[in-house]
């Protein structure tokens, strides 16, 4: 039987083809389904599944159960592969060829678009406005209807045609005495001896120099070092309508001589002669006309033609020349240069702490110290600010005599003269001049990103920022948050009839795109926000808004937890957006754990029953109501309320009324807050998206504690001080970043258990006979690793215009080690066999070795018994990586004075995983430690001992503490959205 055509009895054997009610899905037109047969990618167990097309379909299940394997690695990957396969071989050369996922057949697929969290732009030039393409339309709008101004005096400037200028002149009072001038020199130094001869030959007779009119053959002698203004007298006339033709011809000639700029002097003097007279402000009125954009007061400020590229900070025409359009510059941070506790001689100047005591650099600094009255043998903290400034910025051209005990190019005992450049100028020069990437990166350790002092973060040239629409330049528009931008665009912007024809369609597109961003809960984001500062959830929702704006139909969208980082209040907006995408006749496939999203789905698929090797099966599929009634579905039990995360019976009290207090927090949108975090309890910082939670906890608290307690080179956000740090000895940030950056990293190496395993193998009789040490059992260094694949287990074969192919190493057959290392065994297993064990298997295998077993048990306890000891770090989800980190912390001895900081630890976790996570976090706090969690998940919020709720809105309308207290106290507070939603969860 082909294409899954089976009778009903056979269908009932695989619930993936059935709704929980038992009816086969094939009752409808087969074309209405994506039909998957025999999917075996990663841990999928040969599953068969029909997914309805043009519906909102949610895939859920435990972390590691195979949701992403089905949605992304199978369905999306195959949809994308087929689309790429349909292109020419020339196009595929640039796009690459995707591997075919492991399945029998898939029918009914559409071209697929993935909207995940891993594709966030890391380009510092990308902003919210550029990613959503709103900036492209803003550039077009400003280029077509923007009003240019002088960047110095800010007066409006315009350009006119010859006819416009002539008509303006003819409107002056009849009988006016006028002199038409063509500016040929404007505020330039020189004698300009050539002017007299050059223009006499062209038939001109008079010139105005610095306000005084001269005959050209009597051109004055000018001071070479002074700035001068020189205008050629093109014509003189008394205004009369009959002179229209002459005036028009003269103005045209003057515009050509003045390169588009002319001056018209309205003379108030009645005398007939003008030679030698100072025709300045007292007796004349100066009128300036231009064919180009030019300021009459500052004519040297050239304003180019308004084109879209002029408003791009990625193009040299518009980008700030100082920061090249980045808005920021890398600059040496004096705080990172000094180690205040050491003397200069001991290496207190970090960039030069490896120099020898008799080095040229140190001798020169000793000479500076001797002359300016300080010693290189006292701790830097004891030096005055003035002395530190000398060390950092040098002493100018002041020279010092330095005696050298000769070596190399220096003569022994010779005395040399030298200036002292200063630490910061020296590092800046070397950073600019060096061709060595190593040297540049080494210097960048002492640099920090600072706002560009030329454009002040606007990224554009002053002349570009002087172009406005209703008083706002393009940077002002981008500095608005999404909500404020919509308010501005909803106003009745006044344009001329011609401008309105141009602006109306552009504004319509901008308004739509910004509205879509508001609809996905991003109303607090400023359009100028750098894309690389967005969280995964924010970046994903921006891409979602962009896709809605594209208006595509008949597409398969695959999304990965779009509700991440979203407050419950904004969830309804997100669900409406997903439905809107579906209503455009698209299939929307969402991997999600949020209960509201699941209940809003047209179709729900539950993958399980466990994680890893114990998962990969379709447990239940059908409408949310059908899943809720399915006793086999773990998800269904939580949806129906049959299973719940219990509310804690008691709440912990702060440890002896001890608090960690942040005073005067002013970073980003924080409103000069003073916040008290109780010690010895679990505190959740909640609040709507963009309210300032991450700024307070990560940028200020975590960075300051890491710098103070661990000497990390982190710079805390703006605040006055933090009190109570002396009650802590460690600060550990447990986030969802990978546990390693290379495929060689794995749980065994990260947790440190691999060291104990290698040492165990080194004690085996065979290893001792051969003299093997623990290093012999490392796959990262020569000795025991296979040198054919250098310990990778696979060899990479470059396929040029095809993607690289990885082939199992023919020498070690994927075992990573050479034959000699594999001959050493423990309980019949070699080192490669151990790395291929799951955590569950390894716990049993090493049960008699506490140093190994105890660490592995903590990984087992966090629900990761299914992962393998040697599994590559790059294959773990964010939730799995975070739980490995938590397990590592659990295995360490608790001091009771540790602060743990977690940012949305429930990302990627099923409700049952959240239940398990809460029990583990409770164990960490039970040891007397303190935990601060940023979280939207109401199960975590209700389990907290203390809640700090921020708001009331996001962006500039946030940054305040709107409620503090126990979950029960917050739930009674009608002023906080968190409290309103929390009430249901406390019942």
Locate the predicted segments by residue.
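Conserved phosphate-binding elements of NTP-dependent enzyme cores
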Residues: 1-987
